Regions:
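Anionic-ligand binding patches
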Residues: 2-12, 46-195
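N-terminal beta1-alpha1 ligand-phosphate binding loop
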Residues: 2-29
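Cofactor-binding loop segments of dinucleotide-utilizing enzymes, especially the Rossmann-like FAD-
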Residues: 16, 36, 119
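A generic "binding-loop/recognition-motif" signal
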Residues: 19, 38, 182
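Short loop/helix-cap segments at secondary-structure boundaries that form the rim of catalytic
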Residues: 22-26, 43, 66
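A short beta-strand-loop structural module common to alpha/beta enzyme folds
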Residues: 32-41
Length: 195
Protein backbone atom coordinates (compact mmCIF):
# COMPACT_ATOMS: atom_id res chain seq x y z
CA UNK A 1 0.00 0.00 0.00
CA UNK A 2 1.10 3.51 -0.75
CA UNK A 3 0.65 4.80 2.81
CA UNK A 4 3.34 2.41 4.08
CA UNK A 5 5.67 3.16 1.16
CA UNK A 6 5.44 6.90 1.82
CA UNK A 7 6.55 6.63 5.46
CA UNK A 8 10.15 7.19 4.33
CA UNK A 9 9.23 10.21 2.19
CA UNK A 10 8.24 13.82 2.72
CA UNK A 11 5.58 14.88 0.20
CA UNK A 12 5.63 18.53 -0.84
CA UNK A 13 2.51 19.65 -2.70
CA UNK A 14 3.19 22.86 -4.59
CA UNK A 15 -0.43 23.83 -5.11
CA UNK A 16 -2.67 26.44 -3.58
CA UNK A 17 -5.76 24.66 -4.93
CA UNK A 18 -8.08 23.62 -2.10
CA UNK A 19 -9.46 20.87 -4.36
CA UNK A 20 -6.03 19.32 -4.95
CA UNK A 21 -5.18 19.58 -1.25
CA UNK A 22 -8.44 17.83 -0.36
CA UNK A 23 -7.70 15.02 -2.82
CA UNK A 24 -4.35 14.36 -1.12
CA UNK A 25 -6.13 14.26 2.26
CA UNK A 26 -8.74 11.88 0.81
CA UNK A 27 -5.92 9.65 -0.52
CA UNK A 28 -4.50 9.55 3.05
CA UNK A 29 -1.25 11.09 1.87
CA UNK A 30 0.47 13.34 4.40
CA UNK A 31 1.89 16.43 2.74
CA UNK A 32 3.30 19.89 3.26
CA UNK A 33 2.13 22.79 1.11
CA UNK A 34 4.95 24.85 -0.34
CA UNK A 35 4.21 27.55 -2.91
CA UNK A 36 6.40 29.55 -5.26
CA UNK A 37 5.18 32.19 -7.67
CA UNK A 38 5.76 31.13 -11.28
CA UNK A 39 4.99 33.07 -14.47
CA UNK A 40 2.78 30.55 -16.28
CA UNK A 41 3.93 31.36 -19.80
CA UNK A 42 4.59 28.68 -22.39
CA UNK A 43 5.98 28.60 -25.93
CA UNK A 44 3.17 29.23 -28.43
CA UNK A 45 4.03 26.17 -30.55
CA UNK A 46 3.01 23.81 -27.73
CA UNK A 47 -0.37 22.09 -27.96
CA UNK A 48 -2.71 20.35 -25.51
CA UNK A 49 -0.81 18.09 -23.05
CA UNK A 50 2.52 19.60 -24.16
CA UNK A 51 1.35 22.83 -22.49
CA UNK A 52 0.38 21.26 -19.17
CA UNK A 53 3.51 19.08 -19.11
CA UNK A 54 5.64 22.19 -19.70
CA UNK A 55 3.87 24.23 -16.99
CA UNK A 56 3.89 21.44 -14.38
CA UNK A 57 7.64 21.00 -14.98
CA UNK A 58 8.20 24.77 -14.92
CA UNK A 59 6.54 24.91 -11.49
CA UNK A 60 8.81 22.08 -10.30
CA UNK A 61 11.90 23.84 -11.72
CA UNK A 62 11.23 26.73 -9.30
CA UNK A 63 12.30 24.40 -6.46
CA UNK A 64 15.61 23.43 -8.12
CA UNK A 65 18.30 22.84 -5.49
CA UNK A 66 15.86 23.01 -2.56
CA UNK A 67 14.84 19.35 -2.31
CA UNK A 68 16.41 17.06 0.26
CA UNK A 69 16.83 13.30 0.24
CA UNK A 70 13.41 11.78 0.91
CA UNK A 71 11.49 14.74 -0.51
CA UNK A 72 8.99 14.20 -3.31
CA UNK A 73 7.78 17.43 -4.87
CA UNK A 74 4.46 17.31 -6.71
CA UNK A 75 3.37 20.09 -9.06
CA UNK A 76 0.51 20.19 -11.52
CA UNK A 77 -1.27 22.23 -14.14
CA UNK A 78 -4.71 22.01 -15.72
CA UNK A 79 -6.05 23.57 -18.89
CA UNK A 80 -9.20 23.35 -20.91
CA UNK A 81 -8.29 22.58 -24.54
CA UNK A 82 -11.02 23.77 -26.88
CA UNK A 83 -10.98 24.21 -30.65
CA UNK A 84 -7.19 24.29 -30.81
CA UNK A 85 -6.68 26.76 -27.97
CA UNK A 86 -5.86 26.56 -24.27
CA UNK A 87 -8.34 28.16 -21.91
CA UNK A 88 -6.74 29.05 -18.61
CA UNK A 89 -8.30 30.91 -15.71
CA UNK A 90 -10.53 33.87 -16.65
CA UNK A 91 -9.28 37.34 -15.75
CA UNK A 92 -12.76 38.72 -15.05
CA UNK A 93 -16.52 38.08 -15.35
CA UNK A 94 -16.65 39.12 -19.01
CA UNK A 95 -13.93 36.64 -19.95
CA UNK A 96 -15.60 33.92 -17.85
CA UNK A 97 -18.88 34.50 -19.70
CA UNK A 98 -17.10 34.33 -23.06
CA UNK A 99 -15.30 31.10 -22.10
CA UNK A 100 -18.40 29.29 -20.85
CA UNK A 101 -20.47 30.39 -23.85
CA UNK A 102 -17.78 28.99 -26.17
CA UNK A 103 -18.04 25.58 -24.43
CA UNK A 104 -21.84 25.29 -24.59
CA UNK A 105 -23.20 22.63 -26.92
CA UNK A 106 -19.71 21.31 -27.63
CA UNK A 107 -17.11 18.87 -26.36
CA UNK A 108 -13.76 20.03 -24.99
CA UNK A 109 -10.83 18.38 -23.25
CA UNK A 110 -9.61 18.97 -19.72
CA UNK A 111 -5.92 18.13 -19.46
CA UNK A 112 -3.98 17.88 -16.21
CA UNK A 113 -0.27 17.17 -15.95
CA UNK A 114 1.40 16.18 -12.70
CA UNK A 115 5.16 16.37 -12.20
CA UNK A 116 6.98 14.33 -9.53
CA UNK A 117 10.50 15.33 -8.42
CA UNK A 118 13.14 14.14 -6.01
CA UNK A 119 16.71 15.48 -5.87
CA UNK A 120 17.75 12.83 -8.44
CA UNK A 121 14.62 11.68 -10.26
CA UNK A 122 11.71 13.21 -12.15
CA UNK A 123 8.60 12.07 -13.96
CA UNK A 124 5.66 13.89 -15.53
CA UNK A 125 2.35 12.24 -16.39
CA UNK A 126 -0.89 13.62 -17.80
CA UNK A 127 -4.55 12.75 -18.12
CA UNK A 128 -7.18 13.93 -20.59
CA UNK A 129 -10.94 13.91 -20.03
CA UNK A 130 -13.46 14.79 -22.74
CA UNK A 131 -16.32 16.92 -21.38
CA UNK A 132 -19.55 17.61 -23.28
CA UNK A 133 -21.52 20.70 -22.26
CA UNK A 134 -25.23 21.24 -22.89
CA UNK A 135 -26.53 24.55 -24.20
CA UNK A 136 -26.96 27.07 -21.38
CA UNK A 137 -28.74 30.41 -21.39
CA UNK A 138 -26.87 33.67 -20.78
CA UNK A 139 -28.97 34.03 -17.61
CA UNK A 140 -27.79 30.63 -16.30
CA UNK A 141 -24.16 31.40 -17.12
CA UNK A 142 -24.34 34.85 -15.53
CA UNK A 143 -25.97 33.40 -12.40
CA UNK A 144 -23.16 30.87 -12.09
CA UNK A 145 -20.43 33.50 -12.52
CA UNK A 146 -22.05 35.84 -9.98
CA UNK A 147 -22.69 33.15 -7.37
CA UNK A 148 -19.62 30.92 -7.76
CA UNK A 149 -16.87 33.35 -8.92
CA UNK A 150 -14.99 30.74 -11.04
CA UNK A 151 -11.90 32.90 -11.55
CA UNK A 152 -9.54 30.28 -10.12
CA UNK A 153 -10.66 27.56 -12.53
CA UNK A 154 -9.38 26.67 -15.99
CA UNK A 155 -12.16 27.24 -18.51
CA UNK A 156 -14.13 29.28 -15.95
CA UNK A 157 -16.09 26.40 -14.48
CA UNK A 158 -16.01 23.76 -11.77
CA UNK A 159 -17.63 20.47 -12.74
CA UNK A 160 -18.44 19.85 -9.06
CA UNK A 161 -20.40 23.11 -8.82
CA UNK A 162 -23.91 24.15 -9.88
CA UNK A 163 -22.97 24.63 -13.53
CA UNK A 164 -21.58 21.09 -13.69
CA UNK A 165 -24.78 19.70 -12.20
CA UNK A 166 -26.97 21.38 -14.82
CA UNK A 167 -24.61 21.84 -17.76
CA UNK A 168 -22.46 18.73 -18.19
CA UNK A 169 -24.13 16.26 -20.52
CA UNK A 170 -21.44 13.57 -20.22
CA UNK A 171 -17.72 12.97 -19.79
CA UNK A 172 -15.22 10.41 -21.08
CA UNK A 173 -12.37 9.86 -18.65
CA UNK A 174 -11.63 10.80 -15.06
CA UNK A 175 -14.12 13.05 -13.27
CA UNK A 176 -11.44 13.86 -10.69
CA UNK A 177 -9.14 15.05 -13.48
CA UNK A 178 -11.74 17.68 -14.39
CA UNK A 179 -11.94 18.77 -10.74
CA UNK A 180 -8.17 19.28 -10.86
CA UNK A 181 -6.21 16.08 -10.18
CA UNK A 182 -6.26 12.65 -11.85
CA UNK A 183 -6.20 10.86 -8.49
CA UNK A 184 -5.94 7.32 -9.86
CA UNK A 185 -2.94 8.28 -12.00
CA UNK A 186 -1.28 10.15 -9.11
CA UNK A 187 -1.70 7.13 -6.82
CA UNK A 188 -0.29 4.68 -9.40
CA UNK A 189 2.60 6.99 -10.27
CA UNK A 190 3.56 7.47 -6.61
CA UNK A 191 3.56 3.68 -6.16
CA UNK A 192 5.97 3.32 -9.12
CA UNK A 193 8.01 6.40 -8.19
CA UNK A 194 8.75 5.10 -4.68
CA UNK A 195 9.94 1.63 -5.82
Amino acid sequence: MLKEKLQDYHIILASGSPRRQQFFKDLNIEFEIRLKPVEENFPKHLKAAEITDFLAELKADAFEGELNTGDILITSDTIVWHEGSALGKPADAAQALEMIKSLCGKTHEVITSVSFRTPDKKKTVNSTTRVSFSELSNEEIQYYINEYRPFDKAGAYGIQEWIGLIGIDHIEGSYFNVVGLPTNLVYKTLLEFTD
